[in-house]
């Protein structure tokens, strides 16, 4: 038995250099001539570090964004993915602890007219897997990377949702302004047509001029209807983001919008590294790396320490005769 244990320990030390225990290291080296000039490496308050409430100050837009963060189905799904990954990570951490099983049993027997005999037992078994070849360690690191990836994915969905609601809202404001101008133009052309018709009745204009003015007036009327249809379509898109029935959304005007003027763009490399979709892709690669290590570890033996203990009484209901037993096994099975 001692020889087997020593052999397994020596084997684990030998196989430690086979990539099972290696740590994920992202590639960070870049060519020296990648950038044309030097840049200031001081940290700056970039646009990506601003809270969305500081960027979008319109109260109507803020209300729509808050509603979207509560009701959007894609964002809710991303939040559930985070909870799922958190549970998987907790399960991977608990795999390092011993496992216990309790299975109480009881029997009642009677022969002829004798008094009934009661028997009961309370066995307890425990097992503990030794992570010699790093299977559980790599599985935990993989679960940790997937948990971080789910957090980054949730942040990416959140960013896309906020940007989508804001873009749709400002599109509505732009269409509102165009509709106001088109209606003013419609009224102006209506008066022009009436004036031209009066001139024709006075003999100062012909019918061709009136027809030309009317054609332009009807064209402006058609543009008003097109803008109203576009507004309805954009409101339907906004309702889809908010997961609610389409309606007429209360909103401000384009002239009342205010945006912060004092903010730095930031360093492009840092802005790229701060993007949640980029971080999510990096975490996915890290999880695949540790998943590969865990798969390699499955080719080596798994060592499990197991033991059992129990208390039993099978003599009679008035006599206690506890018997305890415990044993230790060291199986070595090769998992393929």
Q: What feature does the model see in each segment?
A:
Residues 43-67:
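Regulatory alphaC helix of protein kinase catalytic domains
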Residues 136, 145, 152-267:
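Periplasmic alpha-helical coiled-coil/stalk elements that build and connect Gram-negative outer-membrane
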Residues 2-16:
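Sec-dependent bacterial lipoprotein signal peptides
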Residues 35-44:
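N-terminal targeting signals for Sec/Tat export/insertion, comprising classic cleavable signal peptides
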Residues 132-140:
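Short, polar/flexible loop-turn hinges at active-site or ligand-entry regions and domain interfaces
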Residues 7, 48, 61, 192, ...:
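N-terminal alpha-helical segment
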Residues 18-36, 66-131, 163, 233-249, ...:
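A small-residue-enriched
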Residues 14-20, 195:
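Hydrophobic membrane-targeting signal helices
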